[in-house]
Amino acid sequence: MISLPPELARKEARVPATVVMGTQWGDEGKGKLTDLLAKEMQVVVRYQGGHNAGHTVVVDGESFALQLLPSGVLYPFITPVIGNGVVVEPKVLLDEIQRLEARGVDCARLVISGSAHLVMPYHQELDALTERYLGKNKLGTTKRGIGPAYADKAARVGLRVQDLLDAKIFRQKLEVVLKEKNAILAKVYNRLPLSADEIAGHYLDEYAPRLAPYIGDAVGLVQATLAAGGGVLLEGAQATFLDLDHGTYPFVTSSNTVAGAACTGAGIGPRQIERVIGIAKAYVTRVGAGPFPTEVSGELGDALVER
């Protein structure tokens, strides 16, 4: 049974969860509203995406750029959670934690779902090689391995955060999947194979000991918080038109970005969501490849870009 901090175990009316999401192609300013709402929450959950999404939060006049960490990490009274729907690149996450702690932010409250999947070196290499192979038909990915990581999750061959806690299981899974990845690298892209020992050395010896204190039952924490009447903010990355199913496919991200993804990515039921807040901005922008029907060019377009 998860024990809650005293401030969560209060006898008040139950406060269901709130979802904050973008309604366009991203960069709508979700971080600003998240910052305002977070102050009335006890838990803030990032429920999908990876380090391909960034957002900026301003707290007490200080600006913080975040990639994987939810904005709740900036508040000492909030438990920040990385949900099972996120794909985690350990080095990026640890570097982000280190940068924040160097600025006086305490990240010890962070909880990472053991069911979240890991972004592996072969994901990043295959992402870049596939884009190059597609040439003029490329999708414009960030080449950070997000798509291949989600593909392995769907194929049921992905490694998860909790695998870092058991070296034997991690190595067994790694050797199985790496055999296939190396065959693709060699026979399709004429690349040298990756070393299982080298990958395991980084992930088990370098990353696992530092991430272990954060790994826990994220779903249990969220449910216990809601049951105790605590507020939970579900923080989405990217936006609606980049959703894998409902966006401008194939020029989309590799996860579901709409409100429904908060249920699967954080482990809550739809009836536990009280509010879904969609953020839009006055004029739409889009980064990367893909259709943009309302694009403004010329002098006005240049002026909007500069602003």
Language-model-detected regions and their locations in the chain:
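Non-transmembrane, aqueous-exposed alpha-helical and coiled segments at domain scale
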Residues: 2-307
